[in-house]
Amino acid sequence: MDSASLVQFASALHKHQDSIAGSNTFVMYTVPADAFLQMTEVKMHEELADAGVLTEFDESLGKAMFVSHQWLSATHPDPDFQQLKVLQDTLRNIVAGTSSISQALFSEIVYGRRRGPAPGDFASGHLHIWYDYFSIPQSHGGRASRGRQTAIQSIPTYVARCEFFVVLCPALKHKDQKRTLSHASWGERGWCRTERAARELSTRKGGYVIVVESATHQSLLWGGLSMRDAPGEGEFTLDGDRVWIGRMVTQMVWSKLFYYLEHRQFHNYRFLLNAHAALYFRALDLEPIDGLVPGFHTEIDPSVDCKGFMLERFLHHNGLRNIFERDAAGWPPICFAAMSNNVVVLQALLDRKVDINQATTKPATELTLPAKLTALGIASILRNKEAVELLLRARAQVNYKDGFGGNALHTACGGDNPRGVRLLCDARANVNQQS
């Protein structure tokens, strides 16, 4: 069960307005799909505004589509109208029924087929396109520059208002770099990762994330990518953009944590509270958020028992009543501690004889995580090196089978964690274990 302090705090919260929205949000300009489908060249925001093509999006107009993409040149997003031509043909094909959106192969194998968007959802009469070059001021005047900065800061709000988040990534050559851009290169860009994070952290219910690789090849994005593609570890043309990214991501995480509390989604709150440093803050100059719940008090003197004090604080902010009880989703405290890379709390739990191999009982399907994950498996997939080292020193079982039949070595590979793989192999993880 959840602790009384967590339940009381959630009950006391007033309706929390999204902290990334508000009076400073730039207008959400979109292009109606009817006008978009008639385009033969990419014109910038100011030209479209002067021509009366842009609309101020409102949900009463229909559904919006956020287009995330890489620019095909240093000065223009799509100089030869190649990228957007693919999106035009994609929309026409889906509506005509000559192309359909497939599910990510791995999630379909594991969890079965799920409902995707219907062709009618893309009917041009009620679809509106958000695209950076259309929707954000591009000129160099002072007013446009201020508007551009505000619009960029408003991207999480735009993403949250869009039913569709489209990764537009056909294989096309960059005009200046002479390399081919693709879905893989999109995933390497820091800003693209931030836009993806904005979708994951939005408070919107429903919607779809669609990868468009050609006019006849579209698929739903696999959720497992978020476990290894932190925004700060992406590539940036300007390293100073990391400061912008840090502010945006911090606001998004705070907003989502409060959303989970307001809606009493306490497991999701714990998951994000403990995982956000690895998933979203890594490689950014940010301090992790270590708690929101007020009213912490304990009789433990931190100068006498630092580990015990930190353990009590951890339990309080996670809304856990004791060190042995699982939450409603089947996750024990030791797994949350491993997720946050909190080695002080991990050691305190081990000192109190908590089972080091205690595993989750339910899967996290939205992130394609299986049931029966141990603290070692969780620390491995999140690349929490210090937690992995501590758990291995404490003799965690390296070949414990998770719900997919794999071990911590499999999760380390899934998290793109070469250091973890090396540590686990040194600890004699079974490289031949089959899932």
Give a label for each model feature.
Residues 324-333, 359-375, 401-407, 434-435:
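Ankyrin-repeat boundary/"N-cap" motif
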